[in-house]
Regions:
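A glycine- and Lys/Arg-enriched "phosphate-lid" helix/loop adjacent to the NTP-binding pocket
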Residues: 94-165
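Hydrophobic positions on the alpha1 helix immediately C-terminal to the Walker A/P-loop
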Residues: 16
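Walker A (P-loop) phosphate-binding loop of P-loop NTPases
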Residues: 10
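NTP-dependent small-molecule kinase module
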Residues: 19-21, 137-199
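Hydrophobic anchor at the beta1->P-loop junction of P-loop NTPases
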Residues: 3-5
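Conserved lysine of the Walker
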Residues: 13
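Conserved phosphoryl-transfer catalytic core
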Residues: 21, 25-29
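ATP-dependent small-molecule kinase phosphotransfer cores
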Residues: 29-122
Length: 199
């Protein structure tokens, strides 16, 4: 089983992933915990480039998208697909839905570019995607409390409003796969809500 976790900054994805990871391990199941961008040594290097705040040069939106997909291709081939072949459960902090929300809805890139990349480089989609939804201000306050903000976290409120709208669009278009979780609840309540969808 392949499960991805989506949402804007500070909505509690990491906490939920840990809880679900523990839940499956207690059932004796083998679980692979991973993230995007990242998940392999090479993809983590790309992640560092993507998140770094560079005051000397602004990264173009196309460059950002292509770097994310370079990391994703490596991640799929080296981690996700081998784990699924071995009947392991894969829990990924973000996947392709993040690219639609951040790069298409947030940055304004065309959906055609994303579709082309997905058709060529994404051979497997999650069975379940949890979208943790909370007011943007709440998530950003949580992100600031964690310390120094990365390149994405430093974006304006208007950007994250568009990102959230992107996630909402996906949720409405694929309700069978994408499950919206109310991330204003306590971590335990969010976890219990997620378990209902996992049976």
């Amino acid at each position: 089983m392949f499960i991805s976790f989506e949402g804007t900054e500070g909505v509690g994805k990491t906490t939920l992933i840990r809880k679900i990871h523990q839940h499956f391990e207690e059932q004796g199941k083998q679980v692979v915990l991973t993230r995007e961008p990242g998940g392999t040594p090479l993809a983590e290097q790309i992640r560092s480039i993507l998140l770094a705040v560079n005051h000397d040069e602004n990264m173009s939106h196309d460059t950002e998208l292509l770097l994310i997909y370079a990391a994703r291709a490596q991640h799929l081939q080296q981690v996700i697909l081998p784990a699924l072949v071995s009947n392991k459960i894969v829990l990924s902090d973000r996947f392709t839905d993040a690219s639609f929300a951040y790069q298409c809805s947030g940055r304004g890139l065309s959906q055609e570019k994303l579709q082309l990349l997905n058709q060529n480089f994404v051979s497997r989609m999650p069975e379940v995607t949890f979208w943790l939804d909370a007011p943007i201000e709440l998530g950003m306050n949580r992100a600031r409390e964690r310390g120094a903000l990365d390149r994405f976290e430093q974006e304006k409120l208007s950007f994250f409003t568009k990102v959230r709208e992107g996630y909402e669009t996906l949720w409405k278009s694929e309700p069978e796969r994408i499950k919206r979780l109310d991330a204003t609840q306590s971590p335990e309540q969010v976890f219990e809500q997620a378990l209902q969808y996992l049976g």
